[in-house]
Amino acid sequence: MFKIDIVRSYGISKLYLKEVMIMHGKICCFFGHRDAPDTLADDLYTAAEEMVLLEGVTTFLVGGHGNFDFLAAQTVRRLRMVYPHIRLVLVAAYASALRSPRVKEGGFDDAFVPDTLAKVPYKAAIVCRNRWMAQQTDFVIAYVIRAEGGAYTAVEYARKKGKKVCLI
């Protein structure tokens, strides 16, 4: 079904997202401020559902840091009740994040650290992970209200890479 590789230093599975895209549709990732309000839940659901119905998205990537990522993952889990073919993938910045009970019980179809982050300094890992996600994705759903910070930087990078960005 999916081609799976074992990431040498982490001992966890990694999806080859290009194959997923070809075989199962398009990819959408989420970028947003960690202090995002819970009131975004309905807007996130609407935006993600439009990605499924109008753009053919079947795989959603989330980062797992902060409230926005929590809301995004929760949204995809809700969407899976209606669209069981969609996938939720956690792209972690650190291997230690994969051992968290939240990840193990979080309803993710896969969770991994991109192998390109193996030698990245700890403080740069989230920025590098966000760039990796922006490179892999077709679409971005974002919550950015400040022209600063990691979410803003990730969205700007995705735009430079020609990705379609949906701001909520």
Language model regions located:
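Short, Lys/Arg-enriched N-terminal segments with co-localized hydrophobic residues
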Residues: 4-22
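Acidic/glycine-enriched connector segments
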Residues: 22-168
